[in-house]
A protein has these predicted regions:
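Divalent metal-dependent phosphate-bond-processing catalytic cores, especially two-metal-ion Mg2+/Mn2+ enzymes
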Residues: 1-5, 9-17, 48-56, 60-131
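His-Asp-centered metal-binding catalytic motifs of divalent-metal-dependent phosphohydrolases/nucleases
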Residues: 10-42, 58-62
């Protein structure tokens, strides 16, 4: 939970949209429920309530996040490059660089889950964009 709170706190402090703050909070919600495809799981939950761009960022963040650690595990850290040229490539790389990969700091002062409740309620009370 702390990683997600840090990610969302960083997004909020950088004046991200309410939608992106909620996406930052929930981007890893699938870690325990769907460890083999956690990003796709999180994107599926958010998809009816967020833009195509936000859905894509959440869905692909796992691949983009590999840039920071995959080479230590014998994998290709540049796997994300297969999406170069995609209109959301830069936004996804930025999401990972500024908020996701830097949110493992045990000394970071995160907001609480309660602080994000109004954002979550706002986004999930929208009329769904899609089903």
């Amino acid at each position: 939970l702390e990683h997600s709170l840090q990610t969302a706190t960083r997004a909020l402090k950088e004046d991200a949209s309410d939608e992106m703050i909620v996406a930052a909070l929930l981007h890893d919600i699938g870690d325990e429920l769907a460890p083999n495809n956690h990003a796709e799981f999180a994107a599926a939950i958010l998809k009816p309530y967020v833009s195509e761009k936000t859905t894509w960022i959440v869905e692909k963040h796992g691949i983009f996040q590999m840039y920071y650690y995959a080479h230590h595990l014998g994998f290709n850290k540049n796997e994300r490059d297969k999406y170069k040229g995609h209109e959301y490539y830069s936004a996804t790389a930025e999401f990972c660089e500024k908020w996701d990969q830097s949110s493992f700091d045990p000394n970071y002062k995160s907001l609480t889950l309660k602080d994000f409740e109004p954002y979550v309620r706002k986004i999930f009370s929208r009329n769904p964009y899609s089903n």
